[in-house]
Curated annotation (Swiss-Prot):
Described function: One of the essential components for the initiation of protein synthesis. Stabilizes the binding of IF-2 and IF-3 on the 30S subunit to which N-formylmethionyl-tRNA(fMet) subsequently binds. Helps modulate mRNA selection, yielding the 30S pre-initiation complex (PIC). Upon addition of the 50S ribosomal subunit IF-1, IF-2 and IF-3 are released leaving the mature 70S translation initiation complex.
Ranges where the S1-like domain occurs: 1-72
Name of the protein: Translation initiation factor IF-1
Keyword Protein biosynthesis: yes
Provenance organism: Campylobacter jejuni subsp. jejuni serotype O:2 (strain ATCC 700819 / NCTC 11168)
Keyword Cytoplasm: yes
Length: 72
């Protein structure tokens, strides 16, 4: 998949689920299931409920995403 195909959108973490999955409410009020990107997992960046995050979505599946950045 080319990097140009992703949709980036901001959201808020609602709930932490097992296996580093999270429920995230996007700015457009949709709730999706997300996992942490590999670089964030490698650097032990912790995600807690209430955190503002940047999420990447693919055009193929708009109900699953990848958390790529946690805002401070």
């Amino acid at each position: 998949m080319a990097k140009d195909d992703v949709i980036e959108i901001d959201g808020t973490v609602l709930e932490a689920l097992p296996n580093a999955n999270f429920k995230v409410e996007l700015d457009n009020k949709h709730v999706i299931l997300c996992h942490i990107a590999g670089k964030m997992r490698m650097h032990y960046i912790r995600i807690m409920p209430g955190d503002k995050v940047k999420v990447e979505l693919t055009p193929y599946s708009l109900d699953k995403g990848r958390i790529t950045f946690r805002y401070k």
